[in-house]
Amino acid sequence: MKFEDLKIDQRIEKGLRENGFVSMKEVQQKVIPMALEGHDIIGSSQTGTGKTLAFLVPTLQRLVSLGWGGGDGLGCLVITPTRELALQIFDVLSRIAKYTVLSTGLIMGGLEAEDELLKVNQMNILVCTPGRLLQHLQENPYLSTANVQILILDEADKMIEMGFKEVLEDILEYIPQKKQTLLFSATPKASTARILKLEDPRIISIYKEEGFPSQLRQYFYMMRTGDKINYLHTFIGSNPEVKGIVFFSTCKEVKFHCLLFERLKLRNRIFCLSGGMSQKQRIDVFKRFVKEKNGILFCTDLGSRGLDFPKVDVVIQYDCPCNVETYVHRVGRTARNSERGESYVYLVHGEEKLLTDIQKKGWIKKQEGMEDKGISEEITEGPGVQIRCINNMVKRLVRSSKELNEYCRKYLVTYEKFLTFSSKRYSEGVIRKIPALYEHFGVSRDQSH
């Protein structure tokens, strides 16, 4: 089914066509017709399935059909958990709404609230993060929500996980009861919909627990804690043309490894993205990595939910994820839109339980014809490679650089705290190896505490 088959305004259709959106994906085919009829929607769909257009297209059509314009004020609120996801949604919205008269705006933490003060009430559609939106609702006399027709909550489950439940409840106090609500989550959890108290929502789920994309190859490596840096250096150094994402546990760990790999002077361009960066820095990195054909992004789980980085060849999980769901979200950054992708997870003794847990979830399942294509959904041990040991080189770099030494200590301290407070199912064995990790980097544990 194509977008042109929908009874939508020609200006919206033109914006879609101009940006290469011609055929509808499954979630769009199921959601858009019901949303156009005015139904409330509770949808669950994995990231990368096209749910952004599933809520933006009916929103634009609703407001255009009402003759909405500048004098009508705010007609739609789109609330999403992270600044990067808000930026991504706003980019798509701006492009497909190009030929309509609707004004669009973006408000999010990390930018000056004063700069947004007078602009927000001039917008017909606002994309926002929950904390900044509530701040405007409470403090900005220019923002009126009296005419809001549509409320969209994207990645609603993630907002709850991030502690925004009370913030969302406060926001709802400012929104008219008579409105259309579109709620989307990456996973089908009823708890995320309860706060909205919808009377007769349409439930749409295309969440497929039975398997990963058939074009995804998944590998694991069992190793000693101190060998992780050797494996990562070997992979990056041997693959200068790939576009990849490496997931770490903490912001300080991301920063340290970015500084370290800059000094190792490989041919790959290294990008760094974490919650510890300023908003301007995060936006700049996000935009640059999206445009790059190759390069390696070092990030925390900030980059594992919702963000759509095109043509990512490989995902490396440097640290074992806290649970199977996090593993799934991370590997979901590659093998998107029917393209091939590879995933590697580095495990130390005690963390192999992750593989068992994935098996128990039933998400490891071979599909018909996969063997013929040389692709397997099984998570298998990674192919044998000649690993270059750089431990001594890393020690010398850490000792000779005050900045690197400082961030190495911060990384190790925060990593130990992270393991202490995270799920003990995978981390107990790793915590005992922390002293050895200090030795591998040549820093004193006593001075770090």
From Swiss-Prot:
Q: Name one Pfam family in it.
A: DEAD
**InterPro entries named among the record's database cross-references:** DEAD/DEAH_box_helicase_dom (IPR011545), Helicase_ATP-bd (IPR014001), Helicase_C-like (IPR001650), P-loop_NTPase (IPR027417), RNA-helicase_DEAD-box_CS (IPR000629), RNA_helicase_DEAD_Q_motif (IPR014014)
Question: Reaction catalysed by this chain?
Answer: ATP + H2O = ADP + phosphate + H(+)
Show the GO cellular component annotation of the record.
Answer: nucleolus
Motif location (DEAD box)? 154-157
Q: Which residues form the Helicase ATP-binding domain?
A: 32-206
Q: Where does the record place the Helicase C-terminal domain?
A: 228-378
Q: Recite the UniProt keywords alphabetically.
A: ATP-binding, Helicase, Hydrolase, Nucleotide-binding, Nucleus, Ribosome biogenesis, RNA-binding, rRNA processing
Q: Where in the cell is it found?
A: Nucleus, Nucleolus
Function text: ATP-dependent RNA helicase required for ribosome biogenesis. Involved in the release of U14 snoRNA in pre-ribosomal complexes. Required for pre-rRNA cleavage at site A2.
Q: Which family does it belong to?
A: Belongs to the DEAD box helicase family. DDX10/DBP4 subfamily.
Describe the protein's quaternary organization and the partners it interacts with. Answer: Interacts with the U3 and U14 snoRNAs. Associates with pre-ribosomal complexes.
Instruction: Tell what the record comments on domains.
Output: The Q motif is unique to and characteristic of the DEAD box family of RNA helicases and controls ATP binding and hydrolysis.
Q: What is this protein called?
A: ATP-dependent RNA helicase DBP4
Native organism:
Encephalitozoon cuniculi (strain GB-M1)
